[in-house]
């Protein structure tokens, strides 16, 4: 309400909050609820806040940051991956429900990026993308009409492979990560 009052319009809203606990920290239901509270329900609450304003003004754009592991699954990310899959399903449902109102929904698919939430993953930092490059690439695509937005052509191809071969890609990513860190 304060944002709408101050700026008169809300043209875009981006949900980029993320909680990705370490494997051993996400074995109970409470951990799963906490992850869903941030990753899924945070996006739902954002949508519930901005949607009435966007409908009144005749349009707007809502973006949710998703993850390839929400498509493929990933060993050890049993709280995070399903929360991102649910987030993608929410974006699809909202896109269908708001199609006639001029409000569009989009999902951002960044690659594995060097952030605090990915620091514990058993992946060498060299294999993680630079957050500045990813952020700039995604920002350039925020005006695109595509539902799935990636920061680069390579990431778009990799994301398409995840959609085409989800379980196969999940196995591959899990195996590659295990090879990078045999102790994991």
Positions of PLM-derived features:
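Conserved amphipathic alpha-helix within the SDR
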Residues: 1-8
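C-terminal helical subdomain
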Residues: 107, 123-160
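Active-site loop-to-helix junction immediately N-terminal to the catalytic Tyr of the SDR YXXXK motif
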Residues: 73-81, 93, 121
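Active-site helix of classical SDR
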Residues: 47, 83
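Alpha-helical segment proximal to the catalytic Tyr-Lys
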Residues: 52, 96-97
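Residue(s) in the substrate-gating loop at a strand-loop-helix junction
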Residues: 67
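Conserved mid-core segment of classical short-chain dehydrogenase/reductases
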Residues: 19-33, 76
